[in-house]
Every structure is written in C-alpha cells, then in structure tokens.
Design a protein with these regions (language model features):
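Membrane-proximal stem/loop segments at transmembrane-domain junctions that anchor or position
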Residues: 117-215
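Transmembrane-helix signature of polytopic, membrane-embedded enzymes
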Residues: 1-13, 31-32, 260-264
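Membrane-interface anchor segments at the N-terminal boundary of transmembrane helices
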Residues: 189-273
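Perimembrane helix-loop-helix junctions
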Residues: 76-109
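Membrane-interface transmembrane helices that cradle and orient dolichyl/undecaprenyl
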Residues: 35-55
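Short helix- or helix-capping micro-motifs
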Residues: 4-15, 39, 63, 67
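Short acidic/glycine- and proline-prone juxtamembrane loop motifs at membrane-interface regions
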Residues: 19-30
Length: 321
C-alpha cells in the first residue's frame, strides 16, 4: 500500500505529465502497454493453467498493439523473456514466446493483407518506407539528433538501388571515423540528452504555431519567460525518481528479497531502453513511454533510500563526536 501511495505522490508532483496528455503522439499513445504487459505477467504467476492461457493471449495482444504504436514496447517482452531464462523457467518462457509471436504474426499478416489489398501499393510503400537503420545512422552524427541531411541521404537512393546497403556502409564509416573515444563521448552526450530532461519534450508539440497564447505557454514553451523554472522543476523531479530507481537497483543487488526478484525484469527493461537509445537517434521523448516503469522502479527504492540516509546520518553524528 505504501508503495502505491508513494507512486501517486511522485506522479502528482511530476507536472510534465499534465502536459504530455495533450501530446497525441506515439510516445504517449503507447505509454500504457509496457506496464500492462508486466502487470499481466505478474498475474500469470499466481493463476491456474487455464487462466494462464487467457493471460498469455492478452500479453500477446498487449505487445502487438503497443509495438504498432511504438516498436520499443517490445523491449519489456524481451526483458521478461531473459528473466525467465535466467531463472530456468523454460516452459513458461516457451508458452509466452509462442503466444506473443503467434499473435504478432497473425495480426501483422492480416493487417498487411488488408492494407495492401485496399489502400496501399506494395512497391510504392517500399519506396516511401524509411528503414530502421536510418535512425541508427542519424544517431552517429554530431550529437545524434535529427538532421535533414541524413534524411536527404536516405531519400537519395531508391528502394531498388539497395538503400539499406548504402545506409549500412555509412553507419560503419561513421563508427570507424569516431573511433573508441568518439563513440564513448557520443554515448555520454546521448545519455544526457535522452535521460537528462524532465520535460520529456512536451513542448515539441505545443510550439507548433498555437492558435491562441495562454499563460501556460509562458511556462511550457522554450521562449516563455517562466520556461526555465518549469524545466528546472520537472528535471529535478525526474532526476529524483532516477535516484530512487538506482537506489532500488542497488538494494536488489545487495538483497535476496523475493519481492525484489519479481521486479528484476523491470530494471532489465530500463537497461534495455538505455542501450537501445545509445544506438538510436537522440531525442528526449523516446523513453517517455517507459516513464511509468521508471516510476515503479523508483517507488521500490524508497525503503533503501531511507535506510541509506539514516546510515549516513549516523556516520556523520559519529564523525562529529
């Protein structure tokens, strides 16, 4: 109960979410799916075999619909799979894998048949499609942020001209030119940009020629007179939650608590998101659909955080005597 209350308190003070609700984009549209998948996974652990079948199907639907909005949702399914393999729960792993993969395949085949038979020409779609490695390539130039030059580079080649091979060659050339030190510096820059801004980029949507100016624009738009106050507060809350999360992770390493072990896949998910974003285009919005996962991980760190604070206080007292 105390964890639930603490999570609500953290959420209540995280004002950036009040504005993100109006930003109708894939990041926010997919925000419920990672935590819903994990919720179903936890429920399956205490269910009968018959009930588990229904839950596994729901897990497959959750990942399928979520990944259609934002394909990064699939990271939590991978994390759960790794957790099951580490704990040698091979049967459960196989059942979840079959459920998720089967539903994704059925849905994608059905969706593609419908779209290509009624709305899209397959060859035109191939030509207009932007391959995933485009964003990997973009993440290796400058600070890794969006740049129109890379978009023009990708569009310069037709699908039939082996666009993917041209992009892959450019990726390897950029890695080679950066070298180890350059890659490390870029990783630090991208880490700060991706995880170091508590506004979660909501202003990117509200800065598109608003029809009317309101007092809120003074706070949430970068050119507003109060934006720095808002950004500083939002980022402070964000960093506080990250500190709680890291404290909980440390407590997990130092403890054999079974309750904490159940949450291992959540910490693995955040690590997976971090690794993914190091390879992707730099954008502070791209982890926001996993913000609820970070909240849960941070909430679990409150006990360990208080314990560390009390121990530090005692050490300071002893040092002053």
């Amino acid at each position: 109960m105390k964890y639930a209350v603490f999570a609500l308190v953290l959420f209540g003070f995280s004002v950036q979410f009040y504005f993100l609700g109006g930003a109708v984009y894939t990041d926010m549209l997919s925000v419920m799916f990672p935590v819903l998948f994990f919720y179903l996974y936890l429920n399956s652990k205490e269910q009968s075999e018959k009930r588990k079948i229904i839950t596994y199907i729901l897990m497959g639907l959750t990942i399928t619909i979520g990944s259609l909005n934002k394909f990064t949702v699939i990271i939590i399914a991978i994390a759960v799979g790794i957790d099951l393999l580490i704990n040698r729960k091979f049967k459960e792993f196989a059942k979840i894998l079959v459920s998720v993969v089967s539903i994704m395949m059925i849905f994608n085949v059905t969706f593609n048949l419908y779209m290509y038979s009624s709305h899209l020409d397959r060859q035109t779609a191939k030509g207009e499609n932007t391959p995933y490695n485009h964003w990997v390539m973009m993440g290796l130039k400058g600070d890794g942020v969006y740049n129109p030059e890379d978009y023009e580079f990708t569009r310069k080649y037709d699908y039939d001209e082996n666009r993917n091979s041209k992009i892959n060659k450019e990726i390897f050339d950029r890695i080679k030119n950066l070298g180890f030190c350059g890659i490390f510096d870029l990783a630090m820059t991208k880490s700060t940009a991706d995880f170091g801004n508590g506004t979660y980029g909501a202003e990117d949507f509200y800065n598109c020629n608003p029809q009317t100016d309101t007092k809120l624009h003074d706070w949430i738009l970068p050119e507003g007179k109060n934006y720095k106050k808002y950004a500083t507060y939002a980022t402070s809350m964000h960093i506080a939650i990250l500190i709680f999360m890291l404290t909980a992770a440390w407590g997990f390493v130092c403890s054999d608590d079974e309750k904490r072990k159940k949450m291992f896949s959540l910490y693995l998910t955040i690590f997976g998101v971090y690794l993914f974003l190091l390879c992707w285009e730099t954008n502070r919005r791209y982890f926001s659909n996993f913000a609820p996962v970070i909240f849960i991980c941070g909430t679990l760190g409150i006990d360990k955080f208080i314990e560390v604070c009390l121990k530090t206080k005692e050490k300071i007292k002893c040092g002053l005597k």
